[in-house]
């Protein structure tokens, strides 16, 4: 998928255009086939997190500000989201965020094994119609790409407000066998985790159910 530069929604504002022209090269991860060196990318950081499909970057920027010892890679092909991320990085003066303005999967393939401490898949594109389900990100083949890159004991968070995606994703994670569902009580997946930061998409409440939150520990 060659998706960088996907537009949609509003055109970029003049400030966003300037950010893209002047700052993208500073914070983007370079294209290429070579393996990523996360220690070189984030000097002095010892933990590395990944957010796939950061949308308007609210969650990624807030997590980066709250966790300055962590290096965070965010993936998002949409121009507007990338511009928002660059704005957030600059406004918050962050030194621990890098963006991949494209499909996350080829980037994940370039990561060394067992390098990630956390991953977030928050409100991924719902593809609600049955015939569209095959386009959903969380599928067995995606877990096979992601799992080897996560450290044993690392955490992965998935959230959605689409019931069929919640059911399908939970089944996919649990039946994979390498993702231990951390449901502390029968109901805790109904509440946002304490360290969650509300996203723009989440607050639109476009789905057909209340948001659900699934945290997993990597086996
Ligand atoms: C429904 S939006 C949610 C955005 C954000 N997580 C939020 O909660 O506001 C899903 C986002 O995932 C992005 N996305 C979809 N497939 C992706 C992929 N393979 N790699 C990276 N981002 C992807 C889309 O561009 C979109 O911005």
From Swiss-Prot:
Catalytic activity as recorded in UniProt: guanosine(46) in tRNA + S-adenosyl-L-methionine = N(7)-methylguanosine(46) in tRNA + S-adenosyl-L-homocysteine
S-adenosyl-L-methionine among keywords: yes
Entry annotation: catalytic residues: 125
UniProt binding sites for S-adenosyl-L-methionine: 51, 76, 103, 125
Molecular function terms, GO-annotated: tRNA (guanine(46)-N7)-methyltransferase activity
A GO cellular-component term linked to this record: tRNA methyltransferase complex
Lineage: superkingdom: Bacteria
UniProt-listed Enzyme Commission number(s): 2.1.1.33
Pathway: tRNA modification; N(7)-methylguanine-tRNA biosynthesis
Listed InterPro entries: SAM-dependent_MTases_sf, tRNA_(Gua-N-7)_MeTrfase_Trmb, tRNA_methyltr_TrmB_bact
Keywords assigned by UniProt, alphabetized: Methyltransferase, S-adenosyl-L-methionine, Transferase, tRNA processing
Chain sites annotated for binding substrate: 129, 161, 199-202
Pfam families named in the record: Methyltransf_4
HAMAP family: tRNA_methyltr_TrmB
Summary of the function given for this chain in its UniProt record: Catalyzes the formation of N(7)-methylguanine at position 46 (m7G46) in tRNA.
Similarity annotation: Belongs to the class I-like SAM-binding methyltransferase superfamily. TrmB family.
Name of the molecule in the record: tRNA (guanine-N(7)-)-methyltransferase
């Amino acid at each position: 998928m060659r998706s960088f530069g996907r537009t949609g929604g509003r055109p970029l504002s003049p400030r966003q255009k300037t950010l893209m022209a002047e700052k993208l090269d500073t914070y983007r991860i370079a294209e290429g086939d070579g393996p990523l060196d996360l220690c070189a990318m984030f000097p002095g950081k010892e933990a590395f997190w990944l957010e796939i499909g950061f949308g308007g970057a609210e969650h990624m920027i807030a997590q980066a500000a709250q966790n300055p010892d962590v290096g965070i890679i965010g993936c998002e092909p949409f121009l507007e989201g990338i511009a928002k991320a660059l704005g957030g990085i600059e406004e918050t003066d962050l030194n621990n965020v890098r963006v991949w303005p494209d499909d996350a999967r080829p980037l994940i393939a370039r990561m060394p094994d067992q390098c990630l401490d956390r991953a977030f898949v928050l409100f991924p594109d719902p593809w609600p119609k049955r015939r569209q389900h095959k386009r959903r990100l969380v599928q067995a083949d995606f877990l096979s790409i992601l799992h080897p890159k996560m450290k044993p004991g690392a955490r992965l968070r998935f959230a959605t407000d689409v019931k069929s995606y919640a059911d399908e994703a939970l089944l996919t994670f649990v039946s994979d066998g390498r993702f231990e569902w951390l449901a502390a009580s029968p109901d805790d997946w109904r509440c946002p985790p304490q360290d969650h930061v509300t996203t723009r998409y989440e607050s639109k409440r476009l789905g057909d159910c209340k948001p659900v939150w699934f945290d997993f520990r990597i086996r």
